[in-house]
Amino acid sequence: MSIQNLNSLLSHNVKGQTENLLIVDTRPFSDYLKGHIPSSINLDLMQFHWLDTSITGIKQFNRQSRFLLSNLGIQNKEKVIFYDDTSGPTAARGLWLLLYFSYKEVAILDGGFSKWKEKGFKIEKVTNQFQYSRFQGKVNSDVLATSKEINLVIGSKKNSKAYIIDSRSEKEFDGTVVRGGRRGHIPKAHHIDWSMNLANGYFKNYNELARVYSDFPKDKQIIAYCQGGYRAANTFLALKLLGYKKVKVYLGSWGEWSSLQNLPPER
């Protein structure tokens, strides 16, 4: 959603739309207190990392995520808008999380709070309260990859079975910067820094994004990963904007992969 469209909805209190709109600020609470979009609630999604994609780990992730989303007060048929400072990773993570639970009435605010503020739109400092609901979204495994699935991909003799995209920085990818248990990247991964998705804080237009991902056929499975599944969620969204149908986020990402000694790294 554009900042202009959201501002119009809030400014004119469009009947039947603003009442069914939930705006979620995914920045740190300290930033939220300094000013935020009117009526938005705060959920610092960077605090909700999950690095265990074993069968038990995914079951726990599902349980904890439903609890988290219930605290947001998400109701059926309600439009949810996530935002951060730009069109960044935490807002994209919120969108991906709802899609994982088959909730389709979701978007991010393109440009984020920095562009909202830059345009001079209204800002408030009051802390808006959560309204609890019982969220019971149905899991959509088509958007989440596990370490087991990644291992099957890299073990396949057919390189075309799926494409793996590393959304981290180049220095993380080549092992110059070490975050996690080991340095390097997942074998067979292609490196495209998530920041290539943006220009001046907004998502690039279709043609510009298409050039970034021109090496990846739309009929193949794409799996994005980063350190903890946030930058990868931004890549997930970019690919969805381009019309890719089979896109997943490796939830555990490098944080999990590098900690499991039985899984091979590459440099």
Task: Name each region found by the language model.
Residues 1-267:
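Cytosolic catalytic domains that perform sulfur/thiol-centered chemistry
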